[in-house]
Each structure stands twice: as structure tokens, then as C-alpha cells.
Amino acid sequence: MVDDYVELGQLTALRFLEWVSLNPGGVIALPTGKTPEFFIKWVQFYLTNWKKELNNGILAKIGLDKKLLPDMKSLHFFQLDEFFPIRPEHERSFTYFVKNFYIDGFGFDPKKVHLINTFDIPEKARKDFGKIQHLDEVFPDGVIDLGLRVQKPNNERDLLKQKTIKLFDQFCQDYEDDIQQRGGLGFFLGGIGPDGHIAFNVKGSAHHSHTRLTNINYETQAAAATDLGGIELVRKKAVITIGLDTIVYNPDAVAIIIAAGQSKSEQVYNAVEKDPDITYPATSLQKLKHARFFITHSATTLLTLSEENIRQLVKEKKLPSNYFEK
């Protein structure tokens, strides 16, 4: 629990770099958009000034082993989600964000970065699509009707759309399998949306959900509308997202949700104090022993226990000493 968004980014960056140093070759998933702004800045700062900070800075103060070094190129990175469809070169696409801030900014190995490309027909399937290479050729009006999964196509265009949807359903299954075959995510970092969504797992998402092509609700559409040209354009789109079970598949995973400001206090309260319920996606993380909320003081206003009371419980050993991760 910290005072502001800048400190929140610093705290999260330190925990991430500690984990990376202890888990070379680990499997990770990090957020895109506005949520990780200061997290990214602090990670880049510490990577640039690692030796200095390890000898005389905060890395020394927190007792990090001086022999450790975060090997960013060893990590296997999985993109959390993406709009469907969207050009990967679009400056508001999450793929564009990953390439600019994580591959270029953090130095991840591009060969170990798993992207969600929702614009190009996968190369292995192109022979079945003739001259069609991109999804805007399949969905020229931009409308994604996932009902075509089970509906009988009315014409050749609908048949093509149905084939494309099923192709990306298989992509999602393969993506999920790839994560599981690596033992699941070792480190997950995410924000929490206005309806409590984690990645694009909106309220009502099953806690056993996996990577999938799906629709999103109005609250999530509205939050994305400014970046993507207005609500009418966003309402036409679907999304691909990892599932809630994808996040918790590895029982030893470190899962961190960051939330800043009083506007997130209701989502924090629901996630922390409600019993597991599909209405509150973040309650699915309660099964993880290393799940944590990193939050600002203003995001705690609805929590039943005050910070003072929590610290007293820690002092009395009624809560674990690492309840506050700093």
C-alpha cells in the first residue's frame, strides 16, 4: 500500500525484477495500456542503473542478492489480450504496445514473445483462404457476430466468416496449450477494469475460463472507446483474452493486481472481501497463495479493515508478516 501511482509503479517494478532475478527463463504476462505506465518507467530505470542501485540504492536496501541479475532475454512472454480484429501496427493495438515497450523497452527476446495477432490469417491456414490474407477482407464492415459459430451460414460471406472464427478458436486453444505446457504463468501482472475485469475477463466470466475469442460488455467497450475511435466502432469488435483459469493454472504463480485511486476502491473491495463469484472476476485469484493487490491508500476506502488494524493484526501474528509486500 503506497501513496500514489508513481510509488505503485516503483513497488511493482521491484517485485517484478526480484522475481525475474530468481526465475530465469520464467513465463510471464504483463499488462498494456495506461495501467503499467510507471511500472515500465521504473523497470527501465533499474535495468539501466542495476549495478549502482544494487550497491548503494534501493536494491541494496531491500537486500537483493548482489549476485543476481534479471535476464530479460530468457523470459517467455505471453500477451494478455487483444481486440479482434485490429492491425498489429495500429498505435492503440496491444501488440504494438508489447513490441514498443516490452520487446524494445525491456529487451525481451522476440522469439520468446507470444503475440496475439488478430489481423493476419495465420500462415499455416492461408492455403484454405485463397487470396485473402487479412481479417478486414473477411469482415469488411467490422462487425463480428460470434453467433456464426453455431448458426447455419446464409451465404458464402457468412461461411467465410464462420471458417475464420473457428480458425481463431483453434488459435486460442493452441495458445492456451502453449502456456500450460510451460507449466503456466509464473508471474502475472494486471490492472482491474471499471467493471472489475481482469484482462478481458469481464464480470460473469467463468473462473475456469481459458484463452478464447469472446465479446465484451458495455463498460469495457466504453473504457476503450476513446482510444479506438468511439463506442460504435468498439461495439462491433470482439476480443481474444487469456482466461481466469489461465492465470491461476500454476498454483505457485505470483499474481499482482495494481489499482490506484478512489475510483478503484469498489473493485478492490469486491475482489478482496467478496467470496469467489463470477460477478467479480478478480475473486478467482483468491486460490493463489502468492496473489496480491498492490494499491494506493485512496483505493482502500471501502475495505472493512483499516491499514492500522491490518498492521496490528500482522504485529499480533494473526496475519502473515508479508501481508504488505514492500
Q: Language-model segments: which ranges?
A:
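N-terminal glycine-/serine-/threonine-rich phosphate-binding loop
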Residues: 1-29, 38-69, 132, 137-138
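ATP/nucleoside-binding phosphotransfer catalytic cores, i.e., glycine-rich phosphate-binding loops
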Residues: 3, 7, 241-326
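Glycine-rich beta-strand-to-loop/alpha-helix junction loops that act as flexible
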Residues: 30-35, 190-194, 260
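Active-site histidine-anchored catalytic micro-motif
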Residues: 40-41, 45-90, 123, 161, ...
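Short, conserved loop/helix-junction motifs that constitute active-site signature segments
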Residues: 50, 67-74, 106-108, 247-252, ...
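Ligand-binding beta-strand-loop-alpha-helix segment within the catalytic cores
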Residues: 57-186, 313-325
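Gly/Ser/Thr-rich active-site loops/lids in small-molecule metabolic enzymes
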Residues: 200-233, 275-287
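Catalytic cores of processing enzymes, dominated by hydrolases/peptidases
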Residues: 218-249, 258
